[in-house]
């Protein structure tokens, strides 16, 4: 069974990433949802830790997003998802995070 948790950033689900390209600033709005295995033995404790650790997750998303450019972030969605999954499993020392779903809107 999987429980989905939307990553929140100061009360919003939008994580804004700004890119400067050729003197112009562009933005990517990133939304992230984590899939948690409710049958994992550490689910109860880790789901609380994850919900209380949104700032840490947002920082990880921002760090990962900055590896890309404004023009490549949307096309790199699958790579971003797999990299974030590995990063967050390591950060929270858990396998209960089973998926990371990212949506990117560039402006």
Enumerate the predicted regions with their spans.
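Flexible, low-complexity charged segments
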Residues: 1-107
